[in-house]
Amino acid sequence: MGVKKEKGRKRFRKRKTYGNQILPLELLIEKNKREIINSAELMEEIYMKIDEKHTQCVTKYKKTR
């Protein structure tokens, strides 16, 4: 009978990464509605981001005119 060969550490397969996919703000809000509603800080952050987006859109619109 032969001697059993000791197996090395089993390596897991890496998951495929599709770059740094960032979910759109609206989707994130939909997914985490309960948490957001319960947390005033998160609500403030979201309103700030929406305001920033709005000001960016307005400035882009003015530049194209």
From Swiss-Prot:
Any single Pfam family the record assigns to this protein? Fur_reg_FbpB
| DNA-binding region(s) from the entry | 11-31
Q: Which domain of life is it from?
A: Bacteria
Keywords of the record, alphabetical order, are: DNA-binding, Transcription, Transcription regulation
Checking InterPro entries in the record gives: SenN/SenS (IPR025004)
Q: Which Gene Ontology molecular-function terms are recorded?
A: DNA binding
Transmembrane portions of the chain: none
Explain the purpose of this protein: Regulates the expression of extracellular-protein genes of Bacillus subtilis.
For this chain, the family text in UniProt reads: To B.natto SenN.
Protein name per the record: Transcriptional regulatory protein SenS
Q: Which organism is it from?
A: Bacillus subtilis (strain 168)
Recall the taxonomic lineage recorded for the source organism.
Answer: Bacteria, Bacillati, Bacillota, Bacilli, Bacillales
Q: In the UniProt record, what gene is named as encoding this protein?
A: senS
